[in-house]
Amino acid sequence: MVLLILKFHGESVKIKPECAICIIRQVVDAANEITDDEREQFRLIKSTMEVIKDVYGESAVPAWMGTVVHRYLKKISNNNDPYKNLKEKANKIALQYLDKVREMSNTDDELERLRKKVLATIAGNVIDFGAYSTGINIEKLIEDTLNGELKIDNSRKLLNDLKDKNIKKILYICDNAGEIIFDRVLMEEIKKYDKDIVAVVKGKPILNDATLEDAKIAKIDEIAKVITTGSDIIGIILEECSEEFLKEFESADLIIAKGMGNYESLTEYEDKIDKPIYYILKAKCKPVAENIGVDVGDNVLLKR
């Protein structure tokens, strides 16, 4: 078996023992999305666990390990997009709440408005749209997030950077389907500062990450140039990205990266990146939370 071999450069989020639980859960979830046949689910899970044994170790990066595992699962299942139905449902539900999120995140105070737009994008990540039925009060979950706090709050720094005339182009690296609908809310705010936005989605399906199809549904192309990584890797691994992405990555004046996968992978390159990076995420697991210096469940807007 040929595995993904990458040379990383800096200190970042490494695998912890408890990461095994998460990756196995993801495999089980994916198998359930692929087929209802329990016998086939067992086959997919057992086979993929052999790959996990090869890549699971204390020096691995979670996003890298997840990429190897999910690529293998797609291959043996002959299913290039196991989460397709879940992504479609997530987008559909998120669109129903887009106008409400715009309204709830609007205020006259410039700094507070930016903070709420950031929280709006986190709300898209907090709420697993595909997992909720009509019995769940999604609007309340969104409202609670918008009225919540950023444990690390670099909103003032972001506002100052948006006002900086020397910062012209922003590379906005998206995370999940559904969530990308709410990313539009923050992008609309950024455009008020006369910035060019280059939105990045995955080149091929992986997990429930946003692709070009999801960007079109969110109408991101109306306010930003949309490109792909050219790959299906989780997070950003520069060695696998397209020339188009690398060109935009190099020429951007500022980067906004959504979600834990992008944090896990981009922190590997921080000593090589000569521009500000803002990470927007909810710390959903202990390894990421400890690396950032927050508690599990905290919302973060972090400038590096």
From Swiss-Prot:
Gene3D superfamilies: Uncharacterised protein PF01937, DUF89, domain 1, Uncharacterised protein PF01937, DUF89, domain 2, Uncharacterised protein PF01937, DUF89, domain 3. InterPro entries: ARMT-1-like_metal-bd_sf, ARMT1-like_metal-bd, PH1575-like. Pfam families: ARMT1-like_dom (PF01937). It comes from the Archaea. This is Uncharacterized protein MJ0202. It comes from Methanocaldococcus jannaschii (strain ATCC 43067 / DSM 2661 / JAL-1 / JCM 10045 / NBRC 100440). The lineage of its organism: Archaea, Methanobacteriati, Methanobacteriota, Methanomada group, Methanococci.
